[in-house]
From Swiss-Prot:
This is tRNA U34 carboxymethyltransferase. The lineage of its organism: Bacteria, Pseudomonadati, Pseudomonadota, Gammaproteobacteria, Alteromonadales. Its EC number is 2.5.1.-. InterPro entries: CmoB, Mo5U34_MeTrfas-like, SAM-dependent_MTases_sf. It comes from Shewanella loihica (strain ATCC BAA-1088 / PV-4). Gene3D superfamilies: Vaccinia Virus protein VP39.
């Protein structure tokens, strides 16, 4: 069974220690709820990942663990077959002992858009909300973060992350907790909080912004990336049953409306640093994610629209700072 004991040990003498009052019980409940289904099968695969310590690691320009020269052809093929059991791989790419995991998303492109605008991560404690399989967490570590905690409730994402971590070495201060942000006790401790690709999935986006704020220390930085539409500060798209075939998209604000939401949630120094239309090269089907992808979600006659007729995905990145506590916001 996947253990979180090393995480508890690492935060025992840190500014995250108050989580120890509640998180062990919360994660214990998660483990009990997932003792059936796919998780035990994936854990058996994880237990087969016994490979030599990597001869090289690069988290600064990519996520690379081990060179292609370290394993025999047979060992590489066995490793590839094991990693294939964790398909679909959505966020990446990863290079593991010479095996290139070409994921659905080019998450490295998103990082290249976001990273130049954020405060340096050196020695910072970072929370990544909706972290997926953890690609950006490794890049944050590569940029010098002291500790990175990611949260995402998906058991598959947890196992994909654990596969990379076991190959890289378990001593890295990066941890994925299979939880949603609503399950986290407020901490007011993180230097930087990322929420990328999450806000439009929330029924109450303002509550999500307040939950993000509650994890930040005063003066800490929020990095928020989400879908937006064109329009003024009063423009918000509320899709019907589906948006891009997704049935869990609730609100798509304009960039100006999102700026107003952030200020309403008591963030200051709010600025939009990037707006980018998602390209068919950035999100697509691959060997490692052979299911439908962006091209299938767009109008075949007009890629500026989704199949439902809404504007095609456009993503904005905002940077904001947590203000002094406001007792009127609860």
């Amino acid at each position: 069974m996947i253990s979180f004991s090393s995480f508890y040990q690492q935060i025992a003498d840190s500014n995250l220690q108050h989580w120890l009052e509640e998180l062990p019980a919360i994660l214990g409940q998660w483990q009990r709820e997932h003792k059936h289904g796919n998780l035990p099968k994936w854990e058996k695969v994880l237990n087969k990942l016994h490979y030599p310590a990597p001869d090289r690691i690069d988290f600064t320009t990519r996520v690379e663990v081990g060179s292609g020269d370290q394993l025999s052809k047979g060992q590489q093929e066995k490793l590839k077959n094991l990693l294939k059991l964790f398909c679909p791989w959505r966020k990446g790419p990863f290079d593991l002992h010479g095996i290139h995991i070409d994921t659905e998303w080019r998450s490295d492109w998103k990082w290249e858009r976001v990273q130049p605008h954020i405060s340096p991560l050196k020695n910072r404690t970072v929370l990544d909300v909706g972290c997926g399989s953890g690609y950006h967490m490794w890049r944050m570590l590569g940029d010098g973060a002291k500790r990175v905690v990611g949260i995402d409730p998906s058991p598959l994402f947890l196992c994909q992350f654990e596969a990379v971590k076991r190959l890289a070495g378990n001593d890295h201060p990066v941890h994925l907790l299979p939880l949603g942000i609503e399950q986290l006790p407020p901490l007011d401790a993180f230097d930087t909080v990322f929420s990328m690709g999450v806000l439009y999935h929330r029924r109450s986006p303002i509550d999500h912004l307040l939950q993000l704020r509650d994890q930040l220390r005063t003066g800490g930085e929020l990095v928020l990336e989400t879908l937006v539409v064109d329009g003024d500060e009063n423009t918000v798209l509320v899709p019907g049953e589906r948006y891009g075939k997704m049935n869990n998209v609730w609100f798509l604000p304009s960039a100006k409306a999102l700026e107003a939401w952030l200020k309403k949630a008591d963030f200051v120094d709010v600025r939009c640093v990037d707006i980018d239309v998602t390209s068919l090269a950035e999100q697509r089907s691959t060997e490692w994610m052979p299911n439908e992808s962006l091209v299938d979600y767009l109008d075949p006659n007009d890629v500026s629209l989704t199949v439902e007729g809404y504007p095609a995905p456009k993503r904005a990145t905002f940077i904001a700072v947590k203000n002094q506590p406001n007792k009127d916001l609860v």
